[in-house]
Every structure is written in structure tokens, then in C-alpha cells.
Amino acid sequence: MLTKAFLSPAEIEERIAQEAASDKDRKLTPEQIEAIYSNGTNILVSASAGSGKTFVMVERILDMIGRGVGIDQLFISTFTVKAAGELKERLEKRLTKHLGQAETDEERAFLSDQIAKIGTADIGTMDAFTQKLVNQYGYLLGVSPTFRIMTDLAEQTLMKNEVYADLFNDYMQGKDAQLFQKLVRNFTGHSKTSKAFRDLVYDIYSFSQATADPEKWLCQNLLKGQIEAKPEQAKNELLDGLKDGLLADFLAFLRDHLGIAQREFAKAKYLNNVSDAIILLEGSLINDQTDMEDLLKQLLTLSGGTGLTNMTRPKDEELKAYKEAYNKTKNEFVAQLREVDTQLTVLEVLTKHNDDILPMLELLQSFVLDFSDQYLQAKIQENTFEFSDIAHFAIRILEENPEVAVSYRDRYHEVMVDEYQDNSHTQERMLELLSNGHNRFMVGDIKQSIYRFRQADPQIFNDKFQLFLENPDAGKLILLKENFRSQSEVLDATNGVFSHLMDQEIGDILYDKTHMLVAGSQKQKEPHPENETEVLIYNSDESSTSEDEEGPDQAISSGEISLVIKEIIKLHEQGVRFEDITLLAPNRNTYLDLMVSFEEHGIPLVPDEYKSSYLESLEVMIMLDTLRAINNPLNDYALVALLRSPMFNFNEDDLTRIAVQADKGQFYDKLLAAHTKSGLHPEVVMQGLEAKLTLFTETLADWRDYSKCHSIYDLIWKIYNDRFYYDYVGGLPRAEQRQANLYALALRANAYEKTGFKGLSRFIGMIDKIIASGNDLEEVTDLVPKNAVSLMTIHKSKGLEFKYVFVLQMNRKFIGHSKDGLSGKYIINREKGLGIKYLADLKDQINTNLPKLNVVLETLTFQDNRREERRASISEEMRLLYVAMTRAEKKLYLVGKGSKETLTQQYGTDVENNRLPVALRDQIATYQDWIMALDTAFMRKDLKFTVRFVEDEELTPEAIGQVEVKAAVDADDLSNNRQTEEIERALTVLESVEKLNHLYAPAIDLPSVRTPSQLKTFYEPIMDTEGVDIMDKKEGVQPLETASTFELPDFGQKTKVTGAAVGSATHELMQRLTLSDTVTLQDLTQALSRVSASDQVKARVQLEKLLGFFDTELGKLILANRDKLRREAPFAMLAEDPASKEDFVVRGIIDGYLLLEDRIVLFDYKTDHFTHPSELKTRYQGQMSLYAKALSQAYQMEKVDKYLILLGGKDLEVVEV
């Protein structure tokens, strides 16, 4: 076996010196070398943005392999499946290269072995690993290895609801029913359902599942805050803090003011109250026996109304400003005093009710524990689990079975984890159990921890960072701060912002020289003044923005969009390609507005994984309502939608004239009355409306008759043909997408009827059930332009880099500051547990005749949790801004909206430790306000960005401009036109036509669909299950008129069984076959009985071969992953003709495929006769490649394994293509 010693610290230092002395263009940094070669201890690599952490990981793995460590001796956890695939691909390429350079047979054999093992090595997500572990050792917990992962949210919700309903009824009728009703009412209020209480239970359950031991957390932490809460003690602490804090500051303020006011406002009446307040405060601060509550009430009485307000009217401008400043500060102090008074009242009430709250929450704790247990039992019974269940099973296996844990610890030379800052406590516990205590390698950057919503806890990284920093014996801390991605203008702006914003208080890390970004190469340091970071703010009147438009989900304004479009057009005119520009949005709510505006200006824009609702797309909704109206014209909503649609164009005036034809009844009856002029007001049915009604009633009647004896597929195409609807949407924005959606509707109707279900009513019922359940059908993948501006969320951009970056909606309010941010009835915290708002009945405390006097009180735990949650939320927003800013390579734009007058005068120049004060950073609600506060408090040269307000006058259509789309042929080019006589002009035209015909011959031969009729002619054979249909350019467009042929009826003749019929029957059987752990001959026979084929055809289907298929490796894989199986899946995609560069349509039906985490397994049944499998492998190579390409595009997954299942030979064969 290949073995080489690892480098010692001295050898690592020597290598660092050698690298520094080398003449390489791009040298490894000393920290990178340390990260690659250090060994023998736990290592934490804090890698700043663009510092090459993936490169370091790959090099470290290769170095270990080069020293004899097998790839199967490494545990490598990645954050996503995609990251794992990319890492495997890099390793395979590098190892293959090393294999070619190997000098000995032993080294070659070892490297070949490692390449072969990459596919099965433990490189992947923690979810994938825990599934593998539970598959192997689940029997120790009684878990069957054939378990299924429940990924469908609807399925999870259904099972949860069933368990919850039974448990809820038990508690409502149990011994603590009265207390339980009080508990439920505390969260549901006057609601007639228990949904709010159910949501609380589900939230607590979900939160507990992100901990390493859910049951332990529920028992020990859920009520920890409430148990430790001492309202009386909190009240005393609040009063004690008044003396040295608020009251002392108020006294100093009043003293300072009185000295000036007695001179400038000597006769002002309010000064007597100021003097009294000073006397009160001086006496109380000296006397330790002062009743602080009484003092507070006296001060509030003195300040009531205009008691302490300066009401004078000085003429001097300086005195006027001084007066206003005094009143403003005084009001702030009084507001704080009132807030303290309110808190004291709440604490007093909480003290009286504290003994009532805990028993109620203990009952809640019991309910959640019972729910967790019963929900798990329900999943065990169905042998289907969530990812969190599998993770906890894995932890239990390793904790309760030391021999299993030891086997893993002995196997792994090193336990590596990428994106360590986004680890959850469950994942951290798994890593601890797999490690031997000194062989962990962790890579991450706390400044990029942005996944709290997935229960990631950046404190895990932070604790390790502090531990290794303070105690090197515990582990080695390596900082990678050199950035190899961005130009100095981007790095300087990022450092300028975060060195004044981020610290341990907000951001969870002190952004000092240790963490500042440093240019990794000389080229990055070259100055480019034109690329200085710009803060672009659309100057708008804040009064025009309502509160409802503000918040984390607020829409982007048209002014911001216009501003961005103008800058992009400007960049484009300077030679910047669209594909080098990226827009980063806080969420996907802005996508549609941006797409529409960009399309209007001719700028191609590709949103990343933008998922619009297929069933809610306008063209599909209109077609569904058309089908509903055909099925039942008495459906008023569907009928009116069809009338208003572009197919018939009835306007509101038309509908009103129809509606008045009867006082009551269905709209269809009124429509018929209007058509026959037999309604209440026939005189209002004018000639134009009469023509519309005639067309509509005749068309609808024709469609209804047609639907009775034709398939839904044919009906849909008839609608497209009759009313030219397919052509109509082809002229709208996003035409290709709309037409693809309509085409897919016909395909799905056909696929639905092929399952054996017939009839328009059933199809509509199926669609309505999908809509009612909140689910959707996948939207058809659109053609994506190559040179286009990209649009994605900040979260999605993490780990990526782009030349020019626009960060949008800098004025969006943070969740913690928004109206609905933290205003719920409960907040859950990992340490303190559940904090609630308590519904207290104060009838006994207040003299009232009311039967009840309910008041909602925030418990101490709720207040504590809200403070922590708010601070944690703001810290993550700060890190999210860091991620956004560090994506740019060349230039960064920060785009927002606001009033110039307000933003430039809102903040002062106060600074603490070269940063904005903590209180101000905590109070600020948007990225934009952070930037503007920095701009006010610090010198512009320290910040390295410029702020520019853009006015409406700068955003006129003329000022914005338009992207010039160059035509392929300039029709107005008359340079070679002889222009003298008519004959010469005619010859010129003919010559031009001939040239164009020759130039575009391939495109002319390639059919282009011009009408729905022609389109249908091409699409008719789409459901052929044995192949892929391509609009072949050799076929051309068939003429509409074809010669009619009539064949004599085949009376009494014996039907000949064709191979195609047997093939179709075989495909249908495999589609109808119900899969379980094993497949028997009886299962196949039952499935065959349901096949819609003649008995002669069924007799030719070879069931023994099909049964044998499930004993093959592929058959076993399908049975083991049947929940990931897709059968008879229709597809349609656009491909480019290599000769003409024009698009043509490829479409077909895929027999089946498995959608696994790391790959797709595609398979196709073939009943063709063959003597050697290679014949069919060659024949269907192209077809399978097209299938694979379609699946790869649809699921964004590169690896597709392709198999042919050959049934036409002597024996069954499974061939990999």
C-alpha cells in the first residue's frame, strides 16, 4: 500500500518559504499552505469570501490520497447535493491527471482504485449519509431498510393533522379538559377553530426536530424561560436601574436646561414645573429609602399635558432652534418614563398571574411530547419518515451502539465539513460522533451564515472560533482573508461598510483587520476609478408610500427598476455583455415586475429557478375555465371568464346588458334570453352584442357536442384552432412560455386519459383537487437566452461570482422591524424555550361590571426571546448584505428608494469605537439606512462608495434609452439597388430573394409552425410510446387538403397481432403495475387484465420476462426507490437545428426514470426483435440521449444513467447506453 509521511510543522514552514521565493504569477498564501498540509489536530478554517476554500479542500484531499489515505477513509460533508457532485467531479479530474503522471505500478493501481471508489465514497450531504447509515443499521432500532422519505409537504400535513385531531379530542375530554380549553383559548382567542393552537404545536415540534435530541429539548428547555422567570425580581431590578440610569440622565438634562432657560425664558410658566422636577429628582437620588414607583408617578404628573413643555415664541432663530431641541429631548425622556411605568404595571400583573401560566404551559409541553411520539409511531407504521427522523435515528444508533460508532471512527482518517457556519445542532452532533476527537477539518465563514430559517446556528462556528483562538491546544485556527475574486474597488467598499458596522454585538463577529478582505493578486489592486461602488437611490416622496407597501415582502418601485435599466443600458453601450450583469434581490416577489419591465426595454433577463404557478398562469386559467364552461355552462364563474377572455372579448358593458335580462337565475340562462331577445330588457341587446352572442352560443354548442365523442386532447386543439387562441398568446410577452404551457395542457390531458380515466368532468375534477390542495403542476421549461442578465436571490448567489452586481431593494425593511415581524403570540428560543403572550382576566383586579376583562400580557420570556430573536435577525441581515456585496468582481451597485431630504438629515455623527453606536445599528431597519448613517458619520474617503440620488427627470423614456436589437437582414439597405428603372428594381428584388433563399435554405426547409392547424398536424403522433417525435425538416408542412381513401370494412376477418400492438400493451402493463417490495406473477397478471388491448395481443405479452426483470440490478433499484419513480412522463423541449440555427420541437413520452438525489436513472422498454443487444443499443442511442438531455434540463442535474430493457430477444437483457 502507498504510504508517505505527513508534513511536520517545520516542513510546512519550509514549504511556505519556498512558495514565497517562487516566481509564480499566483502564489499560494501561507494560510492556504497551512490549511492544505496541517494535520494531527482539529482544524477550523475561517475562509472569507473569494479566498479559495474549495481549492484548499480539494488540494488537502489530494494530498491525503497522495500519502496513502483512501478516499473511502474520508468523511466529507457538503451543504448541497450539487456541491457534492462538483467536488467529486473535481477530484476525479485531478486524480485522473495524477494517474497519467504516476511513476510506479503501485501508485497507478492505488490511484485507479481511488477513482473507482469516488462514486461510493462518503462525499455528500449529511441527509444522504444518515439515510445510508440507517439503511445499514436501522434494524438496531427496528427500522425497516425499505423506508421511504416523505418529501411531499401535503402528505406530511395530512398525517400530522390526523394525529393532531385524535390527540386534541383526547385532551378535550381528558381529566385536565378545563385547563386545556384555557390553554387553547389563550392562542385562538375568539376564533371558532383551533388552527392557531395547532400551528403553535407544529412550530414547537419543528423547532425541536432541529435539535440533536428533540425529546430532551422539549423536557428540559421548552419551559426553561418560564420556570426561571421572576417578575417581582425583574420589577426590582428595573426600579434599581432607574437611579443611575434614566433618572440621573433626566436630572442632568433638566439642570442644564434650567440654567439657560432662566436667562432666556425667565417668565415662562413651565420653569416652575422644571424646578419642582429637579427638586424631586435630587431628593430621590440622595435618599435610598425613596419609593421609586411613587417618584415615577409624580414625575409623570408634572410632565402631563404641557407641564414641562416650552410654549414660548422666541423671535431669535437660535433660541427657536434651542426651544425645539429641548422639547424634542424632553419628550423622549418622558416617553421612556411612561414605558417604564407600563413595564412596572405589566410586571405587577404578571407577578399575580405567574402561578397560573406555568401549569398551562406544562400541559402544552405534555401535549407536544404526546404529539411527537404519536406522529413518529404513525410514520413507523407507514415506514415513511422525514429527513429529521432519519438524522435522529442515526444519532441514536451511534450513541446507543458503541461498536457501530467505533467502526466509523476507526474508518475515517478525517471528518471534513464544508460551509460549517451553516451547521445545525443535529449535524454538529453527528460530526462529533463520527470523529475521534482530533481529526476534524471544518471550513466556513461566519460572515456568510445566512440560513437561520433552516435552523442553522452560527454560534456553533463562533464557539469553535473563540475556543481555538484562546486555546490552540484544542485545535488550530487558520484565517483565509485574501480574496482572489474582486477588484480593489469592491473590496474597499465592503471593508469600508463592515468595519464600521459589524462586531460581536451585531453580526456575531468583530470585523477588524483579522477579517478584512485583502486583494490576493497585484492585478486586483490596479485602480479603476470608474468602477467605484455606487449607492443609487431613487428620490421619492416618502408620504406616497403606505405602511402596507413596507416590510420584508414589499414590492420594488417602478423608479428603482427604471434606474437599474438605465445603468444596464449604459453598461451595454460601453461593451459589457448582458451575461456579465447580475441582479440580486432579497426575495422572488420582485421577479415578475422586473421581467415585464426588462422585456419592454429589450433586455433579456433570466431569473434563477423562477417558478411561476402553472395552473395560475393566465393562459392556462382561461383554458381551464373554457373546459369548465363546456362541461357545465351553469358554472357562472367559468362562463363569465370565458366570455371575458380574448377568445370572445365581451366587455363589462356587454355583461351588464346580459345580466339585466333576468332578476335571478344562472348567467347562462340570462345569456340565452339575451340571445333570443326573450329577457326582461331585449331592447338593450344591440346589434354588436347580438353578433357576439350568436358566435358564442354556436361555438359553445359545437364544443359541447364535440366533447361527447372526442378526447380532451382533441377538444383542446379544436378550441385552439377555432378561436386562434394558441396563435394569440404567441403575440404576447413571454410568448414561447405561454405557448409551451398551452401545449403542455393538451399533453397532460392526453396522459390523463391514457391512465384509463375518461371524460371532461373527471379531468376538471382532478385539476380542481390539485388546486384545492395548494399544489401545482410543473411549468414547462422555457427557452433560456444565453447572453442575458441574470436575476437571483441573495441566498441563491452564495458561493457564486459575477462581474457587475446590482443589489436591489436596499430600502426593504428587515423582518425584525416590520409590522408583522415579531408580533405573534409566541416566540421560541433554543435556550429559553417558549415565550408567550398570556391572556389574563383582570376582572378581579379592576372594579367593573363586565363578566370578563381580558388583557394580553407579554411574559418575561416572550420579551427576552423577542430581544434575542430581533438581534439575531438583524445580525443575519448584516451577513446577508456581506454576501451580496462580495459577489461582485468588477463593480457593485447598491440600489434603493427614499426621500433625499430625509435620508441626508436623519442621522448624526455619533461614533463608538470607530463604529456606528450599537443602539443605532440595532434600531435601523434597512440596508439603505445603514449605508446612509455611515455616509453621515464617516468620511467618504474611508467608506469608498459614492451616494447618488436619481430624480424622475433622469428616468424619462428618452433618458433611459432602449436596447437596439439588430435584425439579421437589413431590409432598408439599398446600397446595391440600381434604382433607375422598374425592370432594374424588379431584378434587384429577385436577386435579393434568391440570395436569401440560398443563405437561409436550411431554415426554409425546417418547418415552422404558423397556425394551430399546422401545429396539430406535426404534434398528432406525440403519444407514440416507442419513440421521440421530431419535426423533421425532410417532412415539411403537410398540405391541409389530403386525398380521401376508403377501405372496405374488415368484417369477420381475424385481426393480425402486430409487434407494435404487443409493445404498446407491454408499456401500458408496466405503467399500470402496482409496485411493492416484491413483484409476483400474479401482480403482472392482474395488471395485464387492466390493459386496453385485445385478448390476442395480451396473449403475446411475455410475463415471465417482465418478472425476471425485477430480479436484475435495475429492477431491484426501481423497487427500492419506487417513491422516486416517474412513469410514462410526457416531455417537450426546443432544440437547435445545426444547419439553420433555428429552433425545432422535440417531444415524446419517457417510459420511466428514477429521480435520485445525485443522479437520474432513465430506462426504456423495447420489444423489437434482436439477435445481439448492440443492434438496439446503436439504434436507440440518439433517442436516449434526447431523453437524458430533456431530464437534465428539467431537473438541473448533470448525471443521467441510461438503460434499455430489451424484451424482444431469447432472454431479457438490460443494457446500459
From Swiss-Prot:
Catalysed reactions, as listed in the record: Couples ATP hydrolysis with the unwinding of duplex DNA by translocating in the 3'-5' direction; ATP + H2O = ADP + phosphate + H(+)
Record PROSITE patterns: UVRD_HELICASE_ATP_BIND, UVRD_HELICASE_CTER
BP GO annotations: double-strand break repair via homologous recombination
Alphabetical UniProt keywords: ATP-binding, DNA damage, DNA repair, DNA-binding, Exonuclease, Helicase, Hydrolase, Isomerase, Nuclease, Nucleotide-binding
E.C. number: 3.1.-.-, 5.6.2.4
The keyword Transmembrane helix is annotated on this UniProt entry: no
Gene Ontology molecular functions: 3'-5' DNA helicase activity; 3'-5' exonuclease activity; ATP binding; ATP hydrolysis activity; double-stranded DNA binding
Domain UvrD-like helicase ATP-binding, first and last residues per copy: 26-487
Positions of transmembrane segments: none
Function text: The heterodimer acts as both an ATP-dependent DNA helicase and an ATP-dependent, dual-direction single-stranded exonuclease. Recognizes the chi site generating a DNA molecule suitable for the initiation of homologous recombination. The AddA nuclease domain is required for chi fragment generation; this subunit has the helicase and 3' -> 5' nuclease activities.
Membership in a protein family: Belongs to the helicase family. AddA subfamily.
HAMAP family documented for this protein: AddA (MF_01451)
Assembly and interaction partners: Heterodimer of AddA and AddB/RexB.
PANTHER family referenced in this protein's UniProt entry, alphabetically: ATP-DEPENDENT HELICASE_NUCLEASE SUBUNIT A (PTHR11070:SF48), UVRD / RECB / PCRA DNA HELICASE FAMILY MEMBER (PTHR11070)
Protein name per its UniProtKB record: ATP-dependent helicase/nuclease subunit A
Source organism of the structure: Streptococcus thermophilus (strain CNRZ 1066)
Taxon lineage: Bacteria, Bacillati, Bacillota, Bacilli, Lactobacillales
